[in-house]
Amino acid sequence: MNLGRKGKPMKISFKKVASIAVSTALVTTGLVAAPAIAATKNLTVETVFQLTSTDPARSFEQTGNMINRALYETLLTYKGGDASTQVPGIASKWSVNAGATEFTFTIDSRAKFADGTKVTSADVVFSLNRLKNVKGNPSSLMNGITVSAPNASTVVLTTEKATPQVLAIVTSPALGILNSKVVKANGGSDAADANTADKALEFLKTQSAGSGPYVLSSFNLTTEVVLNKNTKYWGAAKAGYDKIIVRNVPVNVQRLNVIKGSSSIAVDLSPDQATNLGNKVNVVTGKASNVFFFYLSQNSTFSPATKFTADAKCIEAVRYGINYKKIVRYAGLGAIQAPGIIPSFFSGALSQKDAIVQDTARAKTAFDACGIKDTPVSIGYWGDGGAVNGLNFGSLAALVEEDLRAIGFKPKLTGAPIAVSLPLYRDNKEEMGLWLWGPDWPDSTNYTESFSPGTKVGLRMGWAAGSDSVITNLQTQASTETNAKKRAALFAEWQREMNKRSPLIPLVQPAAILVANKSVRGVQDHPIWKVNLSEIK
């Protein structure tokens, strides 16, 4: 007998008994579903990989910047597509002395790594010294900068001369802060001999050691990199997805996949490819459309026997033999001829009236004077379908080859997969090279400090320190000037002289396009990390 709340017999109808019986049967036979489990929220990003590793001290390519921006946090950073106003990262506040030689940062007391360990100044000192001493491709960012920690929450960066660009430099993902205890326990070193002593590269391919909203799940240099949500993220802007898959996909396939909905974001479409995509995607453009630029470099130490790239007349022949308008037409809507090395996004950029104009007669006269006649000249580039912003390196190289052949050169295209061609270029082993540059930090000094004699790209062209005092003097003045108008004037003059005297020829600035599914929010193009995976929801 069933009793009511007051101890009286409770009447139960036949219908109710039947209902209970049916419900019991459904439960015992497993026909009633268990409470629903929330579906995993994934984001798939497709791009043509420019990637060497996810170790901040060794990664300096666009895809690496995109990934590391989500794994590691820097002292300062930027929001959205902006690259002019720094905002807090690991540092909650900062100050600069009057001479722009001392930069003091206070670490946010809430900042924690993915394992829950508190971020301290010791982690910052270790990370930046490791970057400097590993001597990887981004190590030059720490040139002339000394890091110290007066206490556990304060970091001081010191320079010997005025270096106002330090605040921009510290936003680079290469200056991402690592958990020093974890990295040291897995072979990491920040000692002066870290270029040989540091053994953490392989470890950092298997898991990350940062404080960002995502952690590394898996890494494959040729197929995909997978990130998982950092469930212990300390910041206010939590990860928007449980998992992000960054895939290495050819440009034409990126277009098909984003239309079908099998990917969320396509990174590398050209303006022409970003048309007629249907009503399920958004096309995003940004200021970064004028940040990347393609250029042709000539190596003055490659082949003394031919003396081609060391001869000013040979360089003049190339400079005035190229049909720049044809290249811009190939680059498509939104592209412009690069009038100088510093793109129009930054201070001191040149206008189109300063751009080099093709002069075939002058080019042929210069070619005759340089005296190489039938000597073959090789042009290296990222082959095997390599493309950025929808521009195929091989197609651009073919346009340049056509122009040079028309004035008498015997060019030979020697493109190769990026794993082969990029080291050749960086190690000063290409006679000529067709390459792209995106800023390492968002300031015009990134260009003066990278393309002048004796600098990173200068040395790749065999342009040693002391090769051109005019260029070097302008570079030095621009790097230490703190007055904005004077800086801009120096940057402009430096470029005009580069256009006359350097072994580098700026070609084109392509439009930057991102295509994203309409369900994806927060997609903006950025000049340093292209897509801020941390902001996408």
Model-identified regions with their sequence ranges:
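Aromatic- and charge-enriched surface segment that lines or borders ligand/interaction sites
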Residues: 92-137, 150-158, 257-260, 308-310
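Surface-exposed binding/hinge segments that line
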Residues: 139-192, 220
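Gly/Pro-rich hinge or "lid" segments in bacterial periplasmic/extracellular proteins
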Residues: 174-236
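Structural transition elements
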Residues: 214, 336-370, 386-395
